[in-house]
Amino acid sequence: MNQILPNSFRSGPDERGHFGIFGGRFVAETLMPLILALEKAYAEAKDDPAFRAEMDGYLKHYVGRPSPLYFAERLTEHFGGAKIYFKREDLNHTGAHKVNNVLGQIMLARRMGKPRIIAETGAGMHGVATATMCAKFGLQCVVYMGAVDVDRQQPNVLRMKALGAEVRPVTSGAATLKDAMNEALRDWVTNVHDTFYCIGTVAGPHPYPMMVRDFQAVIGQEVRAQIMEAEGRLPDSLIACIGGGSNAMGLFHPFLDDSSVAIYGVEAAGHGLSKLHAASIAGGKPGVLHGNRTYLLMDTDGQIQEAHSISAGLDYPGIGPEHAWLHDVGRVEFMSATDTEALDAFKLCCRLEGIIPALEPAHALAKVGDLAPPLPKDHVMVLNMSGRGDKDLASVAEHLGGQF
């Protein structure tokens, strides 16, 4: 803990987009006017009751919010400790939490008069959500996706194409999420006049980390109300998986100033922390990537290392800057789960709850298996079930040799 504790953990970022030493906006000169225009447009939209009312209407009638808070009775019984609840973001339209943020950004793009939307995607869920909203609002959609992810997430590639998006496979680097984001940024620099870049996580240059967090905070806001109804009090702990970290930030942020609530973020440990992994907090150091300063996987020369996770949505070599800050000030405890642990949790959830989770939240569920058993039976733990696992079935079957 090497930074001064604030009066509130929810007051950041400052006017230049910093969370302590993290965040900021490190962008090409060409993009700076656009970034400043975006910041201004977002500030105006946030203060406009009509924008909020329109967004709430779509969240209710199109996305299907509020998503349920579900007591996972058999998993609770299996672990024999804490009471486990799932926040069912997998039941949203498009199958994950991504749509909460995309709706907000696409409404903002319309407000700014930008007819062309670009996005990056890893697991494909952000791409699907962006393609969905572009179809709904009649906007052109281009999605950049690493060629490796195109291969392992075919169902989502087909969904994007069915929705009218152009999917551009990226073959540079490791051909995964980082490389897709690089290409999207290149496109944006070239087409600033008519293009809006819809970033899928709490990363990128300010105001993106703040904006994406605000659009995702509906998750935690609903949990506060739902857990009061179910248990009559706030939860004792929250847990979520973290790649860039938007699903986690959406759950965590409304609870950051509740000191009684323990908060756990779970990174992807891949083949193990001494081998190939995607755990930026556990194995990284501060550096600058994609417009912000955060913890990154880097070699001794400061070059970005390739991340690995069985989950296409977690294999990013960085983490959102607000998460980096929350780690440094000690408000959130970060842990990591390996590919094997995530697969075991995936199978357990399928068999005990009749819920096929995405491999991303399966990482968080793996750590629930470590945390929950020794806790008292009245301890209330909420896991963010951030997406459904249809997209991962072929990949899981391949890893398990076809034997579920």
UniProtKB/Swiss-Prot annotation:
Q: Which domain of life is it from?
A: Bacteria
Q: Which GO terms describe its cellular component?
A: cytoplasm
Its EC number is: 4.2.1.20
Tell me the keywords, alphabetical order.
Amino-acid biosynthesis, Aromatic amino acid biosynthesis, Lyase, Pyridoxal phosphate, Tryptophan biosynthesis
Q: Which residues carry this modification: N6-(pyridoxal phosphate)lysine?
A: K98
Q: Which InterPro entries match?
A: Trp_synth_b_CS, Trp_synth_beta, Trp_synth_beta/beta-like, TrpB-like_PALP, TrpB-like_PALP_sf
A GO molecular function annotation here is: tryptophan synthase activity
What this protein needs as a cofactor is: pyridoxal 5'-phosphate
Q: Which reaction does it catalyse?
A: (1S,2R)-1-C-(indol-3-yl)glycerol 3-phosphate + L-serine = D-glyceraldehyde 3-phosphate + L-tryptophan + H2O
Pathway(s) per entry: Amino-acid biosynthesis; L-tryptophan biosynthesis; L-tryptophan from chorismate: step 5/5
Query: What CDD domains does the database record attribute to this sequence?
Result: Trp-synth_B
Write one Pfam family the protein is assigned to: PALP
Task: Give the HAMAP family listed for this entry.
Answer: Trp_synth_beta
Which PANTHER family does the record associate with it? TRYPTOPHAN SYNTHASE, TRYPTOPHAN SYNTHASE-RELATED
> How does the record describe its quaternary structure?
Tetramer of two alpha and two beta chains.
Please state which protein family the record places this protein in.
Answer: Belongs to the TrpB family.
- Tell me the function of this protein: The beta subunit is responsible for the synthesis of L-tryptophan from indole and L-serine.
Q: What is this protein called?
A: Tryptophan synthase beta chain
Originating organism: Rhodopseudomonas palustris (strain HaA2)
